[in-house]
């Protein structure tokens, strides 16, 4: 969300933003037809990665993705992989050895997309902004440590799920424990970032810095993952979910 509309310091900062960062509440207050198009078409410069909800959207009408939104949707990828890990644990506890390839592929995505890319963005750009301002330093210290611990657990999952790895009962038990530990750590980790760390960026960054960070994130995403970027990773996760029979969202609806 670009601006909440609430009387907070964060909103004061974002009101200085150029027209490209029009807030969602502001958009809702504008007429859905002519006035809305005029407001969006006023965007200038090179905005961060646009949202592509409508196929007929012109470049002038595209709504930019902010840095916190970018990081939060990447957390969505992580959440889906944690669900894959949960399904893997369920199957391992039922003496099912079949999920090993899917778990290995999931751990590879965590390594390349979450740890080597997403986590590095946080450590290089997000945490320093807060630490330099003397804000949330106790939290960023813990988050950095958890990033390191996560890499250790991912190393173990990758090693345990290779084709050459022994997959006897003790190995399966250890794998399930490592995945459970990863889930237990990163669920509160990403929740704290989404609700405390990322919102605090508005208190310590100018509108220009906020926009520049979003552009930096977009450039790095495409450099590492190609033009499709984030969507290509989402598609890979969806394929893994389908292979495990957990892609259909309706199956999670209680009766």
Swiss-Prot record:
Region (Disordered): 42-67
UniProt cross-references to InterPro entries, sorted A to Z: Hemerythrin-like (IPR012312)
GO-annotated cellular components: plasma membrane
Pfam family of the protein (one): Hemerythrin
Signal peptide boundaries: none
Protein name: Uncharacterized protein Mb2018
Organism from which the protein derives: Mycobacterium bovis (strain ATCC BAA-935 / AF2122/97)
């Amino acid at each position: 969300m670009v601006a909440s509309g609430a009387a907070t310091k964060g909103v004061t900062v974002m009101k200085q933003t150029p027209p490209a960062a029009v807030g969602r509440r502001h958009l809702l207050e504008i007429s859905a037809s002519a006035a809305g198009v005029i407001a969006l078409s006023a965007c200038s410069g090179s905005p961060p990665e646009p949202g592509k909800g409508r196929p007929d959207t012109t470049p002038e009408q595209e709504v930019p993705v902010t840095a916190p939104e970018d990081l939060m949707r990447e957390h969505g990828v992580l959440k889906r992989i944690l669900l894959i890990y949960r399904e893997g644990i369920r199957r391992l506890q039922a003496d099912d050895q079949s999920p090993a390839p899917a778990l290995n592929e999931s751990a590879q995505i965590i390594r390349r997309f979450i740890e080597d890319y997403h986590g590095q963005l946080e450590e290089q750009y997000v945490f320093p902004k807060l630490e330099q301002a003397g804000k949330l330093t106790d939290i960023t210290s813990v988050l950095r440590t958890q990033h390191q611990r996560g890499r250790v657990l991912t190393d173990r999952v990758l090693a345990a799920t290779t084709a050459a790895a022994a997959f006897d009962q003790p190995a399966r038990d250890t794998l399930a424990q490592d995945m459970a530990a990863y889930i237990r750590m990163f669920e509160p980790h990403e929740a704290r970032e989404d609700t405390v760390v990322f919102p605090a960026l508005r208190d310590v960054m100018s509108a220009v810095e906020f926009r520049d960070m979003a552009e930096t994130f977009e450039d790095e995403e495409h450099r590492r993952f190609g033009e499709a970027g984030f969507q290509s990773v989402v598609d890979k996760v969806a394929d893994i979910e389908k292979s495990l029979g957990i892609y259909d969202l309706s199956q999670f609806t209680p009766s």
